[in-house]
Amino acid sequence: MEMDEKSDILPRVLEAAKKRRLYLPHALRQMNRPNRMISTGEVRLVIEDGEVIEDYPEDVRGHSCLMLGHGESGRPVHVVCAPKNDYLAIITAYIPGEKEWSDGFSVRRKP
């Protein structure tokens, strides 16, 4: 994917996040798993300081993207989000695994 395609959604993500962040039930369940415990502050850091690593323009929930950033302790965190007119939908958040991701957790490994 070209960088232009991925960077196209970032300004919309940031603008929507300024208005409101809405955590979908799935995101809250994933964030609160005992082996993850991802805080809303960590999600905010990923959105504000992270990078778009995958873009999903055809997502049935609306155009969304996968962002990589680092949480409060420096651990890598992935956040899938979708900008809407009045808010940013947080679809899920998780700690990426080395088996599934390479290049600093920014490139999905081929199966």
PLM segments and residue spans:
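Ribonuclease/tRNase effector modules and their secretory precursors
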Residues: 1-111
